[in-house]
Amino acid sequence: MSKTKTMPTVDPGARPRRVSRRTLLSSVPALGGLLLTGCSRDTFVPPMVRGGLIGIADVLTMSTNRLLLSGQPLAREYQPSEIAPDFPTWGQPNPRDEKYQRLLRGGFADWRLPVSGLVERPLSLSLDDIKRLPSRTQITAHVCEQGWSAIAQWTGAPLLQVLNAAGGVTSGARYVVLDTVDGWYEGIDMFEVVHPQTILAYRMNGDDLPIGNGAPLRLRLERQCGYKNLKFLKSIQVVDSMADFGKGTGGINSDWGFHWYGGV
């Protein structure tokens, strides 16, 4: 995941101006018709719609992409011969967090992933617990917003399996919020949560996940840009709204002005 940002020119203390979904839909009749088909609005509209033309562009881009992906196709998968010999370690290579360093020295034996919020049975999973869940291995391209891409093999537990270990989500669940050791967070909607390639990866290219690539566990969201693929996962929370996280836009990158939906 790319973590060194050239920040957009924004007021860091300001919350993005909200535009009501009713106002937006009235200005985009085609999208309004699409939503009348019975699809969830969350599938087509970001958690917060920004003002002006950029907000309309956000929704049109996301809704068009999601309509094309309505059958939940897989992202392209590659052959082992296409794996990059060197996968960039971008941004934070080794968190300085004291607890993380202690867990690292212990081989992550005491590491735990709390799963809380709108689930039937909140729980805390060890790395071994996650490795015992059904797994998936995929060879995919990581497309970074910084302008580079690289192919790697990832093995991990589908996010849906992790939620099922907690008894599944309860009524009202709309987003899964993932927090990291180094202070990043992202919310992803249920459309991406249920996709089979959305995994929590603990292996890379056949070996344990390297520190620089997010050990012991990272998110792989194969149909979105690299900045959505969080490293160094610390916790998972299922929620009905992103309003109480950061500036309410749905993730730290969109708080900074990037698109919440980073489809590729």
Question: Where do the protein language model's features map onto the residues?
Answer:
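N-terminal secretory signal peptides
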Residues: M1-V19, A30-L34
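Intrinsically disordered, low-complexity regulatory segments
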Residues: S2, V19, T23, D42-P47
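N-terminal export leaders
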Residues: V19-L36, L159, L219
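Structured, non-membrane catalytic/scaffold regions adjacent to prosthetic-group chemistry
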Residues: D42-V264
